[in-house]
Design a protein with these regions (language model features):
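Intrinsically disordered, low-complexity regulatory regions
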Residues: 1-84, 89-97, 459-521
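Short sequence/structural elements of tandem HEAT/ARM alpha-solenoid repeats
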Residues: 70, 108-114, 151-157, 193-199, ...
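Flexible helix-coil junctions and inter-repeat linker/turn elements that act as hinges
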Residues: 104, 116, 144, 148-149, ...
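Cysteine-rich, disulfide-stabilized extracellular repeat modules
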Residues: 106, 138, 149, 158-161, ...
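Buried hydrophobic core positions in alpha-solenoid tandem helical repeats
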Residues: 75-77, 118-121, 161-163, 203-205, ...
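Alpha-helical solenoid repeats of the armadillo/HEAT superfamily
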Residues: 83-97, 127-143, 155, 167-186, ...
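Alpha-solenoid helical-repeat scaffolds
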Residues: 60-90, 94-98, 103-109, 117, ...
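Short, flexible/disordered secondary-structure transition segments
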Residues: 52, 56-58, 87, 105-106, ...
Length: 521
């Protein structure tokens, strides 16, 4: 936050300092939008527990010894090491069923019982694929728990055996191993990179073929998402290079779950800095990503909007790749979407376009989106208004005089000034920056702009901000008042001298008889 404050302070002092502008204006998903990130996490599970819908007849035959009695952990533990194949399988299955219970599975109790090494040993039993499957399932559900529970599975040396099971001739065993690895990778970047280092990517991607059952492919795609997730540190570049061709294939899939996961994977990769953005662009996927902004499923739209939004946090050249795909034609619908979260993401996207070069600013104007941004500035949810304030303020820095003039003609100043009374200091500063930039651009017409600001109640708000606790805000408010509202012709007309308050600030009469002029820079 301190760094952001420094950048904003510098912005006040140096209008049109391009080196700083791009850094501040192009905003990645950081602390400003933490609530969006939380929403994304809710939508996208890091870990999943395998809870069956109903037990099969096969299951009920195998575990008949355990039916009708309260099976103790001691009994499970003892029988899980039995030489009798049926008893051992029944015991491991009983453990799995305990872990598959809907409410509060006794994960910690099972870990404390010492069953982990026994389950891991069962993964080696190529002669008994049913035992491998049940043990893998039980371990999957243990790894679906807390980080400490996942770590217990990792420390029991299960990962190399799960990787080995990816080559099992039995598809259900392969799929369960994929699921377990997905939970371990989902624990965080350390586990992710450990599993990658043991060679998970190639065998995982080999499952992507036309003959794979849809449920299996959904799991594979979900694991790919977890491989792409986390940027502290991001996944190894070699891994990204390996995964991207698979994502370029999966983006054509008709299954909504697979499509959504594929697009989220791309959104995570594009959130990892300009180098990863370039890798995604070079994969050729962007022209197939952009049309998904108008997909009928909101889940697909949301993921696609985040992915393209991340790309336009990159360089002007990277941003242009997205613009060249006719991306702006999708935005009238996104800006009027019934879901507020999509409105907010759409305006965030556009704020990064208005932070670009003048041709990119013009593209937003030509697409007819400025009135829609101003509508969100005036009427949107506060989070959306905040993004709209950035979009407008960025345009006042990046745009030419005629582009800023167009903004004013669209009546941007009243809703812009309304945000000067919010409690969010960052928004207030962004608006003050924008107003000052408009006044600077107006040159000889600055008095006309000043009049508009005064008439909509903006002047009073700026005056009040001279008492703001934030130093940058009160200095900027003072500068605007001093430079544009102190009046050069006061000596000629004493009636124009405003009264001063005790604090030394000016009180203007909004009904002052200023001549109105047609606005024209």
């Amino acid at each position: 936050m301190a760094e952001n404050a420094g950048l904003e302070n510098h912005r006040i002092k140096s209008f049109k300092n391009k080196g700083r502008d791009v850094e501040t204006m192009r905003r990645h998903r950081n602390e400003v939008t933490v609530e969006l990130r939380k929403n994304k996490r809710d939508e996208h599970l890091l870990k999943k527990r395998n809870v069956p819908q109903e037990e099969s007849l096969e299951d009920s035959d195998v575990d008949s010894d355990f039916k009708g009695q309260n099976v103790t952990l001691d009994a499970i533990l003892q029988n899980a090491t039995s030489d009798n194949v049926v008893i051992q399988l029944s015991a491991v299955q009983a453990a799995r069923k305990l872990l598959s219970s809907d409410r509060n599975p006794p994960i910690d109790d099972l870990i404390k019982s010492g069953i982990l090494p026994i389950l891991v040993k069962c993964l080696e039993r190529d002669d008994n694929p049913s035992l491998q499957f049940e043990a893998a399932w039980a371990l999957t559900n243990i790894a679906s728990g807390t980080s400490a529970q996942t770590q217990a599975v990792v420390k029991s040396n299960a990962v190399p055996l799960f990787l080995r099971l990816l080559h099992s001739p039995h598809q259900n065993v392969c799929e369960q191993a994929v699921w377990a690895l997905g939970n371990i990778i989902g624990d965080g970047p350390q586990c992710r990179d450990y599993v990658i280092s043991l060679g998970v990517v190639k065998p995982l991607l080999s499952f992507i073929n036309p003959s794979i059952p849809i449920t299996f492919l959904r799991n594979v795609t979900w694991v790919i998402v977890n491989l792409c997730r986390n940027k502290d540190p991001p996944p190894p570049m070699e891994t990204v290079q390996e995964i991207l061709p698979a994502l370029c294939v999966l983006i054509y899939h008709t299954d909504i779950n697979i499509l959504v996961d594929t697009v989220w994977a791309l959104s995570y990769l594009t959130d990892g800095g300009n180098e990863q953005i370039q890798m995604v662009i070079d994969s050729g996927v962007v022209p197939f990503l952009v049309p998904l902004l108008s997909h009928q499923e909101v889940k697909v739209q949301t993921a696609a909007l985040r992915a393209v939004g991340n790309i336009v946090t990159g360089t002007d050249e990277q941003t242009q790749v997205v613009l060249n795909c006719d991306v702006l034609s999708h935005f009238p619908n996104l800006l009027t979407h019934p879901k507020e979260k999509i409105n907010k993401e759409a305006v965030w996207f556009l704020s990064n376009i208005t932070a670009g070069n003048q041709q990119q600013v013009q593209a937003v104007i030509d697409a007819g989106l400025i009135p829609m941004i101003i509508h969100q500035l005036a009427k949107g949810d506060f989070g959306t208004q905040k993004e709209a304030a950035w979009a407008i303020s960025n345009l006042t820095i990046s745009g030419r005089k005629d582009q800023v003039e167009f903004l004013v003609e669209q009546n941007v100043i009243p809703p812009f000034c309304n945000l000067l009374s919010v409690k969010d200091s960052q928004v207030v500063q962004v608006v003050l920056d924008g107003l000052k930039n408009i006044l600077i651009m107006a040159v000889d017409e600055a008095s006309t702009i000043a009049e508009i600001i005064e008439e909509c109640g903006g002047l009073e708000k700026i005056e009040n901000l001279q008492q703001h606790e934030n130093e940058d805000i009160y200095k900027l408010a003072f500068e605007i008042i001093d430079q544009y509202f102190s009046g050069d012709d006061i000596d000629e007309d004493p009636s124009l001298i405003p009264e001063t308050t005790q604090g030394g600030t000016f009180n203007f009469d909004p009904a002052s008889n200023m001549q109105t002029k047609e606005f024209n820079f």
